[in-house]
Amino acid sequence: QVTPGDSWNVACTVPGDAPNRPEDAGPDYDFGAAPIMAQGSDGRSYLLAGQKSGVAYAFDPDSGAILWQTRVGRGGWLGGIHFGIAADSGRLYAPVFDSPIEPDNPAPARPGISAIDVASGEVLWQTPAANVCNGRPLCEPGYSAAITVTPELVLAGANDGHFRILS
């Protein structure tokens, strides 16, 4: 756990005195997907994870120490990096949702995909999510689903119902 005091669970959404509701729930910045091990351009192994806070992390796989952290999204209980990152050739790819419906965080939403250098945490490029919703109900730009990478492509299913391929 990298966010002290974050014990949010679904009971936090139930009105009244719900069982299992923590007294101080925290911001709901859990890790929605398993971490992945990747090698950086420096030859070192890194344990990588994406958090709903919108922050990507690299940990030392032996000690668990945080080596770097890079913000790529606003984050929130409906935002940040949701359900899967990917890595190849020294790069981490982080899909970000950042729903515009975020009562707890007034910062601007930053949905899209970011490529991050595994060894340094430096953002190499970012591609904002296309907003093709045109007012359709329940349609929001961004990426919640896990993405896939090949040596040349990033494959991503978007929350707006489109499948996108980035090269």
Enumerate the language-model features and the residues they cover.
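Extracytoplasmic/lumenal domain signature
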Residues: 1-31, 36-167
